[in-house]
Curated annotation (Swiss-Prot):
CDD domains: B_lectin (cd00028), PAN_AP_plant (cd01098), STKc_IRAK (cd14066). The lineage of its organism: Eukaryota, Viridiplantae, Streptophyta, Embryophyta, Tracheophyta. This is Receptor-like serine/threonine-protein kinase SD1-6. Keywords: ATP-binding, Cell membrane, Disulfide bond, EGF-like domain, Glycoprotein, Kinase, Lectin, Membrane, Nucleotide-binding, Phosphoprotein, Serine/threonine-protein kinase, Signal, Transferase, Transmembrane, Transmembrane helix. Belongs to the protein kinase superfamily. Ser/Thr protein kinase family. Disulfide bonds join C295-C307, C301-C315, C376-C401, C380-C386. Residues 523-813 form the Protein kinase domain. One of its GO terms (cellular component) is plasma membrane. The chain crosses the membrane at residues 440-460. InterPro entries: Bulb-type_lectin_dom, Bulb-type_lectin_dom_sf, Kinase-like_dom_sf, Pan_app, Prot_kinase_dom, Protein_kinase_ATP_BS, S-locus_recpt_kinase, S-locus_recpt_kinase_C. The gene is SD16. Residues 32-439 are extracellular. Glycans are attached at N29, N41, N92, N116, N171, N256, N385.
Length: 847
């Protein structure tokens, strides 16, 4: 007899599934007779199941919030939070419509959040609905059009701007000044320190505030992007717009393609970033972010100064201006500049054209979008208070006019992007074109004669060389044994040593030996801050009271000159808030010294591995330090003019300023990479044991992934408070990586955390954030370089709790004791013991 399908049984199962779904979620509508409770685990879902609204508790804490997140994206990404500053303290909260308002009630039936619509504005009955573009609205139940909206979440953003959402001032909708405010931390939705605000005076622009202080300025809207965001390049699926009229001054964007999801968010560390979901990679991709480097800091170079990240010092005076204060030893242009010659205001003044610039702060400006550049110049010359002018729109050759009537500050120069800025200067500071032409002609003739003489001399020298025996000097043998960059640096240092009084090569302020001797109390041991592989670092004070750190190169070091020239060459061109700042150098009396900014809190290792000082490093400070180091490394790998591999990242090479801001230092081992290069090989393996990647320590192969490995080791050291090198666990583990990996596999990750953090945080211990950091650290120290993430991915993982993080594979140099050493009664080794090349009895440590 044939088997007959049991259709009744199938229908019953289908009925149960439908019934379960009905009790699990709501539709997009939410009526006055319904309620949403935490205990029921019910949610409201938009019609196309793109967004979802419900209660959530980050990090499995006791704090409950009402929020909106992407349902269609597998990673939980929150885009709006209702009661961010007044969470529910238990899981007995309820959302319901009460008195024609959306209200959240706690377990005692007390309201903790409400839409606060007054009675006169409400038309009964009302309903709530979650729309497909992420807007949660309270509306007239008989009118589902925008005209029927009584309240909407889009008017009260948190840290995220969605498609069709507005940021800025909107008097049209009732006087809303919509701002973004960051989460306090990645696991705490409460209002953080950072916010975006719009200034409508002059030429409107957005500012990022850290509490009450401005940290970054977007620059004015130039028709297709903001002046200070050159990375805000047009993409085919995003339409950006900026509306400015009597009713509103707002920025918004629209994602014009289906199945593409993109957000603008303000992170808990103050980064404004554009993220787009990549379906293939199942992760958020960071398209751009701001602020990006030291030049993005607000008013970094003072009045009439401009910042250029590719020069040293980064602050420069506009032509026709000079530094406000000439310091006796080291010049500091951040104080600003002043005019060399006073304006005449009689029509003889002219303009200096600055290309590829970020426009100055536009608070004191006047705008006329109806005239062109020529009329703008004429208008500027007629008013003596006019200091500069530019186009308001850079599209189609430029149009409109903006005129500055006060000081010019917060200007920077870009390698790419930016626009022309015309700065008014006195006639005497404008070089006559005819004189300039004569100089060029004279210089050309002189150069031609010099080249001819050089050719003749070279010809006779070459003939003489053919008759002589080639002699290889010891220094040439040494040079040939080095890699290509070191060849270049040794040659440069040799040629430079014979010309110690010339400054063209370094483009840095040079100081005399006696000035540094005086500043450091004749290099007194009382002024000694520390000692590295190539010399001693002293604390010093200049005559103007400025504190400095002086790195005095050891005369006994055979490699010191190479590293000195390398460090000068690299750091002079690197400017970032998380990189140590080089102020000058000294090549005098047979000595070579570097002068850095003095950082009050010394190196990270002096705090991290000190039993007393480590108590000052709570988890939030450690997390901020981790983020800062990551940003500095990302700048070296991706955002600087030349790609740089540090090769010696470790705790002692991270310095801390008075605010505990981390700054990567010691570039003596660093290598410059071409943009197309991915890895290089060297026969001279340098670095520090405990931080070297396997491929570098064993084969001399290094790349960005080598630095990522070092960063991973450092991250795990910061979390655990233990050194990787010299770590000794008498039971099973011979290094920190093995210790962390074993606890990770056993599900006991939190046991590796420095106990000081656990004691300090007690009930508010951010478990989820720390677990993410441990996982990121393990990803960075994976044995195979291709498995490790790049630093841009690390930054995204650190900055967003919603980003998917892969499961890590075995770390490099992860070695544990064999079972014979652990327990003499056992003759077998555990299968999950992590080894390298099956060696279990040898001590193998990351170099």
């Amino acid at each position: 007899m044939r088997n007959v399908p049991n259709y009744h049984h199938s229908y019953f199962i289908l009925f149960i599934i439908i019934l379960f779904l009905a009790f699990s979620v709501y539709a997009s509508n939410f009526s006055a007779t319904e309620s949403l409770t935490i205990s029921s685990n019910k949610t409201i879902i938009s019609p196309s199941q793109i967004f979802e609204l419900g209660f959530f508790n980050p990090d499995s804490s006791s704090r409950w919030y009402l929020g909106i997140w992407y349902k269609i994206i597998p990673i939980r990404t929150y885009v709006w939070v209702a009661n961010r500053d007044n969470p529910l303290s238990s899981s007995n909260g309820t959302l319901k419509i009460s008195d024609n308002n959306l209200v959240i009630f706690d377990q005692s039936d007390r309201p903790v959040w409400s839409t606060n619509i007054t009675g006169g504005d409400v038309r009964s009955p009302v309903a709530a609905e979650l729309l497909d573009y992420g807007n949660f609205v309270l509306r007239d139940s008989k009118n589902n059009k925008p005209s029927g909206f009584l309240w909407q979440s889009f008017d009260f953003p948190t840290d995220t701007l969605l498609s069709d959402m507005k940021m800025g001032w909107d008097n049209k909708s009732g006087g809303f000044n919509r701002i973004l405010r960051s989460w306090k931390t990645t696991d705490d939705p409460s209002s953080g320190d950072f916010s975006t605000k719009l200034r409508t005076s002059g030429f409107p622009e957005f500012y990022i505030y850290n509490k009450e202080s401005i940290t970054y300025r977007s620059g004015p809207w130039l028709g297709n992007r903001f002046s200070s965001v050159p990375g805000m390049k047009p993409v085919d699926y995003i339409d950006n717009s900026f509306t400015e009229n009597n009713q509103q001054v707002v920025y918004s964007y629209r994602v014009n393609k289906t199945n593409i999801y993109s957000i603008l968010s303000l992170s808990s560390t103050g980064l404004l970033q554009r993220l787009t979901w990549m379906e293939a990679a199942q992760s958020w991709k960071q398209l751009w972010y701001s602020p990006k480097d030291l030049c993005d800091n607000y008013k970094e170079c003072g009045n009439y100064g401009y910042c250029d990240a590719n020069t040293s010092p980064i602050c420069n005076c506009i032509k026709g201006f000079e530094p406000m204060n000439e310091q006796a030893a080291l010049r500091d242009d951040s104080v600003g500049c002043v005019r060399k010659t006073k304006l005449s205001c009689d029509g003889r003044d002219g303009f200096v054209r600055l290309k590829k610039m970020r426009l100055p702060d536009t608070t004191e400006t006047s705008v006329d979008k109806g005239i062109g550049l020529k009329e703008c110049e004429e208008r500027c010359l007629k008013g003596c208070n006019c200091t500069a002018f530019a186009n308001t729109d850079i599209r189609n050759g430029g149009s409109g006019c903006v005129i500055w009537s006060g000081g010019l500050f917060d200007i920077r120069n870009y390698a790419k992007g930016g626009q022309d800025l015309y700065v008014r200067v006195a006639a005497g500071d404008l070089e006559d074109k005819r004189i300039k032409s004569k100089k060029i002609i004279g210089s050309s003739i002189g150069v031609s004669i010099l080249l001819l003489l050089s050719f003749i001399i070279f010809h006779f020298w070459k003939r003489k060389q053919k008759r002589s025996i080639t002699i290889q000097t010891p220094i040439v043998d040494l040079v040939r044994s080095q890699d290509s960059l070191m060849n270049e640096l040794v040659k440069a240092s040799r040629s430079y040593t014979s010309k110690e009084n010339k400054t063209d090569y370094l483009e840095l302020p040079l100081m005399e030996w006696k000035a540094l001797a005086m500043a450091t109390n004749n290099f007194s041991t009382d002024n000694k801050l520390g000692q590295g592989g190539f010399g001693i670092v002293y604390k010093g004070m200049l005559l103007d009271g400025k504190e400095i750190a002086v790195k005095r190169l050891s005369k006994m070091s055979s490699q010191g000159t190479d590293e000195f020239m390398n460090e000068v060459r690299l750091i002079a061109k690197l400017q970032h808030i998380n990189l140590v700042r080089l102020l000058g150098c000294c090549v005098d009396k047979g000595e070579k010294m570097l002068i850095y900014e003095y950082l009050e809190n010394l190196s990270l290792d002096s705090h991290l591995f000190d039993q007393t000082r480590s108590s000052n490093l709570n988890w939030q400070k450690r997390f901020d330090i981790i983020n800062g180091i990551a940003r500095g490394l990302l700048y070296l790998h991706q955002d600087s003019r030349c790609r740089i591999i540090h090769r010696d990242l470790k705790a002692s090479n991270v310095l801390l300023d008075k605010n505990m801001t981390p700054k990567i230092s010691d570039f003596g081992m660093a290598r410059i990479f071409g943009r197309e290069e991915t890895e290089a090989n060297t026969r001279r393996v340098v670095g520090t044991y405990g931080y070297m990647s396997p491929e570098y320590a064993m084969d001399g192969i290094f790349s960005m992934k080598s630095d990522v490995f070092s960063f991973g080791v450092l991250l795990l050291e910061i979390i655990s408070g233990k050194r990787n090198k010299g770590f000794y666990n008498s039971n099973r583990d011979l290094n920190l990586l093995g210790f962390v990996w074993r606890h990770w596999k056993e599900g006991k990750e939190l046991e590796i955390v420095d106990p000081i953090n656990i004691d300090a945080l007690s009930s508010e211990f951010p478990t989820h954030e720390i677990l993410r950091c441990i996982q990121i650290g393990l990803l960075c120290v994976q044995e195979r370089a291709e498995d490790r993430p790049v630093m841009s991915s690390v930054m995204v993982m650190l900055g967003s709790e919603t980003t998917a993080i892969p499961q890590p594979k075995r770390p490099g140099f992860c070695v544990g004791r064999s079972s014979l050493e652990v327990d003499s009664s056992s003759s077998t080794q555990r299968d999950d013991e992590c080894t390298v090349n099956q060696v279990t009895l040898s001590v193998i440590d990351a170099r």
